[in-house]
């Protein structure tokens, strides 16, 4: 662990990676995103296996509330077949929420635990890594194109990006540029919104942790600040998971809507 404040912050913001440059793989991001997915699958699978028609347990009630809530959102906003979109929305919300929630674990706990196994760098919050959020948003981007082609055909896709908003052949280049920028803005905004909020939240936790190494008065101030930020951060991690899920559903609805253009 680095001895200076700058070194401490830099240490906590360094990924456990393999390779260099563009091709570097952030192993910690990969590991914790997979663990988060397994937690989601384990919980929902167990609830589904133990579901009863009688009085449900607390966990079953919570899962049923989340499933019905998200199914209602999809039903209200997506007017096509929901056999894929509804499970996708549920997966996105729960997966992103679990990954975000890792940020509530004390910032030194997991890195120090990893240090016992000879791992010197570890960042545990996958959604504070732009490569992870971009990866998820690119998957959404691919689904947008898929649902556009599915509902309008390839010819409809071409028309959508060449004859809108100006329906004249002389303005095809202008239409193409405008629609391409609009299309690319969707995954980019999805990725950077989630990344920016979670990175800022992680950094604030690190800065508060720095206070504990100062004098007793500042260290004592850090305790209520840490608690207050953790409570507020619960709202942030939930809201960001909801926004990512909601925008995905809206974007897919726009792509599928045959009467859109």
Curated annotation (Swiss-Prot):
Role of this protein: Key component of the proton channel; it plays a direct role in the translocation of protons across the membrane.
Keyword match Lipid metabolism: no
Keyword annotations from UniProtKB, A to Z: ATP synthesis, Cell inner membrane, Cell membrane, CF(0), Hydrogen ion transport, Ion transport, Membrane, Transmembrane, Transmembrane helix, Transport
Gene3D superfamilies associated with the record: ATP synthase, F0 complex, subunit A (1.20.120.220)
GO biological process, one term: proton motive force-driven plasma membrane ATP synthesis
Superkingdom, taxonomy of origin: Bacteria
PROSITE patterns per record: ATPASE_A (PS00449)
InterPro entries (UniProt xref): ATP_syn_F0_a_bact/chloroplast, ATP_synth_F0_asu, ATP_synth_F0_asu_AS, F0_ATP_A_sf
Protein name according to UniProt: ATP synthase subunit a
Topology of the protein relative to the lipid bilayer: Multi-pass membrane protein
GO cellular component: plasma membrane; proton-transporting ATP synthase complex
Pfam families, per the entry: ATP-synt_A
Annotated family: Belongs to the ATPase A chain family.
Assembly description: F-type ATPases have 2 components, CF(1) - the catalytic core - and CF(0) - the membrane proton channel. CF(1) has five subunits: alpha(3), beta(3), gamma(1), delta(1), epsilon(1). CF(0) has three main subunits: a(1), b(2) and c(9-12). The alpha and beta chains form an alternating ring which encloses part of the gamma chain. CF(1) is attached to CF(0) by a central stalk formed by the gamma and epsilon chains, while a peripheral stalk is formed by the delta and b chains.
Compartment annotation: Cell inner membrane
Main location: membrane
TM segment ranges: 24-44, 85-105, 129-149, 203-225, 239-259
Keyword Cell membrane annotated: yes
HAMAP family referenced in this protein's UniProt entry, alphabetically: ATP_synth_a_bact (MF_01393)
Species, as recorded: Actinobacillus succinogenes (strain ATCC 55618 / DSM 22257 / CCUG 43843 / 130Z)
Entry's Gene Ontology molecular function annotations: proton-transporting ATP synthase activity, rotational mechanism
